């Protein structure tokens, strides 16, 4: 039997251009793509502030997971991508605000740059929908 896929879009201008969804649910699994710090208007928020950008990314991730019937408590893995590795601790503390009791597996890594040079951070998440 073929599993049904559900897709979530957040209106990012990049989603239709490059053929991606913000998040995809297949069965009980939800995968949230690299999430940039964009406001509802599609513009970068918190320019120069890695923790502010991380907070916005996690708000978008939370909305996507909930939009597909999941909960943040179902998150099993996150990835933090930074252009400045020295921002790791302040971004990780914001991550901790969202996941204190959940404590998913996590990877933090530095990248050279993102599509928009104002982005300091992107986050990804994988979740399981609890039964």
Regions found by a protein language model. Give the residues of each.
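N-terminal presequence-like segments and the immediate start of the first folded domain
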Residues: 1-59, 63-76, 82-131
């Amino acid at each position: 039997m073929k599993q049904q896929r559900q897709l979530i879009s957040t209106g990012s201008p990049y989603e239709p251009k490059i053929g991606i969804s913000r998040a995809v649910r297949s069965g009980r699994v939800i995968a949230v793509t690299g999430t940039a710090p964009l406001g509802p208007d599609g513009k970068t928020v918190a320019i120069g502030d890695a923790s502010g950008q991380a907070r916005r990314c996690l708000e978008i991730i939370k909305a996507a997971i909930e939009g597909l019937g999941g909960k943040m408590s179902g998150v099993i893995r996150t990835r933090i991508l930074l252009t400045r590795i020295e921002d790791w601790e302040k971004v990780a503390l914001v991550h901790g605000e969202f996941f204190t009791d959940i404590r998913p597996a996590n990877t933090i890594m530095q990248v050279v740059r993102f599509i928009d040079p104002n982005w300091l951070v992107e986050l990804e998440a994988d979740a399981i929908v609890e039964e």
